[in-house]
């Protein structure tokens, strides 16, 4: 009896070593946790699957080995959720992968093609990383990968953005490729996309309406591309989209063009202005005059050379603040109103302009036998205001020195009032009529 028990124990002992998979024995080359259902066989220089893996494993790490082919070797692991086969020598994704997969990483291999059969029936897959391979083409089928949320195709050799990408995607990384185009409708179904990485490619433009359906987009990278900023017809859509989107754009292309476009949209030319010049004569005041102190306002009248007038003296002191409506054009006077002008600033980007007329003084004038003209300086100081909704714009100042020709003589008498001036003019006209009648 004791001999039979001893013999049976010996058989059971041998059975323990011959069937480790049945009795949950971890393969010698691997580290097993979570009741042997999490198996880590990374960095073991493996080229074939180790024996003894349980069929109910849920996590398998085969990274940093020398696998070249895993076709049909993983099908029986029907509970597998996470598979890491990165940093191997695979030339394609393993065929007939279990449909239970949630996460798969095949980065840093030699995969050249992601075919439709590689992802067929992977309805539960949420994360797929095929970065750092040699992919030149990606073929996806509609209604497959319908649970996929993260797709990493960065650092490959793709030249066009893959079509038929699943609609539940949140993150798509296409950086570090050779992408030159996005076919129409490629991104139209990605309404849940939050992050799109397109940097380090060869894009020159983005076709119209390509990004119009990316309603949930939070971040996009566009730097290190070959944007054709000199061809406005190619880049206009992208510039306008960047101005309107709420997403964080990293690496804004054509910064000079988008800056000028922002200024144009932010400060449009008011209706009624057809000229590109911002002129004094074309403006209307929108505020009252703060202060005006005038002894008598002079009026320049052309007088024929053969007539002389009585000696007059007049003076004026102007102190005046007037606010004008502004545009984004430079503030310049009409050419016929000035003989010389100095413009220190060529931009007036604020919402209003305040004009100060200072020291506009005309003095010491009289007529003698020889009429002479001397320039009278009038300083027009223009200071741009700051719009409330544009705090980043620097304040600017424009100064114009206006010179107006005035008929001058020596000062001897004070300036007559307006009524006296009318009397003098009436008397002069009456005398002129008498002379003409006598001559006839």
Curated annotation (Swiss-Prot):
**UniProt KW Signal keyword:** yes
Could you tell me which residues are lipidated, with the kind given as GPI-anchor amidated serine?
417
Q: How does it assemble?
A: Binds to RTN4R.
Q: What is the official name of this protein in its record?
A: Oligodendrocyte-myelin glycoprotein
State the Pfam families in the record: LRR_1 (PF00560), LRR_8 (PF13855), LRRNT (PF01462)
Keywords (alphabetical) are:
Cell adhesion, Cell membrane, Glycoprotein, GPI-anchor, Leucine-rich repeat, Lipoprotein, Membrane, Repeat, Signal
Q: Could you confirm whether the keyword Cell membrane appears in this record?
A: yes
Q: Which GO terms describe its biological process?
A: cell adhesion; neuron projection regeneration
Where in or outside the cell is it found? Cell membrane
Q: Which residues of this chain are annotated as glycosylation sites? A: 45, 61, 103, 152, 176, 189, 192, 234, 364, 389, 425
Q: Give expression by tissue.
A: Oligodendrocytes and myelin of the central nervous system.
